[in-house]
Amino acid sequence: MALNLQDKKAIVAEVNEAASGALSAVVADSRGVEVGAMTSLRKQAREAGVYMKVVRNTLARRAVQGTDYECLTDTFTGPTLIAFSNEHPGAAARLFKDFAKENKDFEIKAAAFEGALTDAEVLATLPTYDEAIARLMMCMKEASAGKLVRTIAAIRDQKEAA
């Protein structure tokens, strides 16, 4: 389907706006994935706060110019599915990683975080805000438990020495 100039400009502006406010980006090749599976992926992306769009490569290159994701321009070859995480940096990478496990034809091409290419696997393992808070609380809780154990051990050592 041929796009006229206004449609192309609208797509570039839409993707550029999504890229400007995004925390991270992931590029994938969805060739060979069934329509039902892609529909499911789109639904999951909306729920996770991920902007996802299939874009022509030249339009994608223009859209990311001047953003943190200009480093992705070399990965825009073949069918390009681009996703921008808006709420959590690892959301798109985690979504694509899980989807790739179920669909062997789905291939993650690249991921970018803070203006640099990064491994999608690493990006997918970033904890969410709630997970990070929980980990911090566990560390703080363990630190106080460790302090208690050391205090009790010191008291025991004092009693043994006396």
Swiss-Prot record:
Q: Name one GO cellular component term.
A: ribonucleoprotein complex
Q: Name one Pfam family in it.
A: Ribosomal_L10
The record, for InterPro entries, names: Ribosomal_uL10, Ribosomal_uL10-like_sf, Ribosomal_uL10_bac, Ribosomal_uL10_bac_type
Signal peptide positions on this chain: none
CDD domains the record matches: Ribosomal_L10 (cd05797)
**Sorted UniProt keywords:** Ribonucleoprotein, Ribosomal protein, RNA-binding, rRNA-binding
Keyword Membrane listed: no
Q: Does the keyword Membrane apply?
A: no
In terms of SUPFAM superfamilies, this protein maps to:
Ribosomal protein L10-like (SSF160369)
Q: Which GO terms describe its biological process?
A: translation
GO molecular function: any one? large ribosomal subunit rRNA binding
Q: Which Gene3D superfamilies match?
A: 3.30.70.1730, 6.10.250.2350
Member of which family? Belongs to the universal ribosomal protein uL10 family.
Summarizing the function annotation, the protein's role is: Forms part of the ribosomal stalk, playing a central role in the interaction of the ribosome with GTP-bound translation factors.
The family database entries (NCBIfam families) matched by this protein are listed as: PRK00099.1-1
Matches recorded under PANTHER family: 39S RIBOSOMAL PROTEIN L10, MITOCHONDRIAL (PTHR11560)
Q: What quaternary structure, including any partners, is listed in this protein's UniProt entry? A: Part of the ribosomal stalk of the 50S ribosomal subunit. The N-terminus interacts with L11 and the large rRNA to form the base of the stalk. The C-terminus forms an elongated spine to which L12 dimers bind in a sequential fashion forming a multimeric L10(L12)X complex.
This protein is called Large ribosomal subunit protein uL10
